[in-house]
């Protein structure tokens, strides 16, 4: 009976809720904008010259850069089915499309600000538990027009940009790092990309949560 009710609600969601309930889902490939500094989360096959020596993660102003796409996945050692809405408080991984490495953090110092280093780690989408980030947002689900924070699940820092700028060979790109303190520097928003639609049943659950 409960399943039938959800399926019936699915039709209502399609008619009423589709325009204002654009949830972000597993399997989506997106660019993430830091709303304070207007840069998109970016990576490339350039390694840090200090700290971990892993692949660097930066912020770029370019809207068109192909190195700014990230796939949203379930946390380490789990599978999040494509089209599953991301809940506020849910741990996820963000996998860099062009290099196959995951957004990662650990107790190394970032090169410019002295905060916690954020890197890209792993091979072909598989790294370790330090790739997990918890989505912090208002309401039951991460929605496309809403701002979110990403809290590193193991060290509790927030994915942040505070404006420090690199020189060569990545001139003009901003440092991305982890900070313990919540501030306007920690807010991100899903922008361009390919957003996987929820299944009918999952869309029904989203609508039911909003009633």
Swiss-Prot record:
Compartments where found: Secreted
Any single Gene Ontology cellular-component annotation: protein folding chaperone complex
PROSITE patterns to which the protein is assigned, alphabetical: MIR
Keyword hit for Transcription regulation: no
Gene3D superfamilies: 2.80.10.50
Signal peptide: 1-18
Record protein name field: Stromal cell-derived factor 2
